[in-house]
Amino acid sequence: MPLNREDKQAVVAEVAAQVAKAQTVVLAEYRGIAVGDLTTLRAKAREQKVYLRVLKNTLARRAVEGTPFAPLAEQMTGPLIYGISEDAIAAAKVVHDFSKSNDKLVIKAGSYDGKVMDKAGVQALASIPSREELLSKLLFVMQAPVSGFARALAALAEKKQAEAA
């Protein structure tokens, strides 16, 4: 059932609000995907706080107008699903991971930091560890010398106690 003008304006406003908060937008062609698989993809996207939506391309073009994602409008052709995320890599990671297990979902393009990326760029973005993973690695690297120093002091204290006894 076609949308009337007010419904279209509401959809554009909703998507524009998501795009205004977003750091990344990923476009993927979903031709031939079963409904169950699409539902699985949506559930994974929700877990990662990725806004995922099948949208008419004309409405999507209107939603990205005047944003850093406007150059992406040239890529908006064919049946597309739009992944929009405030996290820099979450949308790319969700769509890329799903496309590995389902060859009917084809990554078409993406945009990050005002730059349009092709499929390889989106895959490269998806391969970057999440912020939490990077922070935990940094913490481990910073903590290792301190814990090593603490173990050395404890061993020295034990040695002094053994010599004193």
Swiss-Prot record:
Keywords: Ribonucleoprotein, Ribosomal protein, RNA-binding, rRNA-binding
A Gene Ontology BP annotation from the UniProt entry: translation
GO cellular component, one term: ribosome
One GO MF term attached to the UniProt entry: large ribosomal subunit rRNA binding
Gene3D superfamilies: 3.30.70.1730, 6.10.250.290
Alphabetized Pfam families for the sequence: Ribosomal_L10 (PF00466)
Coiled coil: none
The keyword Transmembrane helix appears for this protein: no
Keyword RNA-binding: yes
InterPro entries in the record: Ribosomal_uL10, Ribosomal_uL10-like_sf, Ribosomal_uL10_bac, Ribosomal_uL10_bac_type
Subunit structure comment from the entry: Part of the ribosomal stalk of the 50S ribosomal subunit. The N-terminus interacts with L11 and the large rRNA to form the base of the stalk. The C-terminus forms an elongated spine to which L12 dimers bind in a sequential fashion forming a multimeric L10(L12)X complex.
Family per record: Belongs to the universal ribosomal protein uL10 family.
NCBIfam families per UniProt: PRK00099.1-1
Primary role: Forms part of the ribosomal stalk, playing a central role in the interaction of the ribosome with GTP-bound translation factors.
Protein name per UniProt: Large ribosomal subunit protein uL10
Organism whose genome encodes this protein: Burkholderia mallei (strain ATCC 23344)
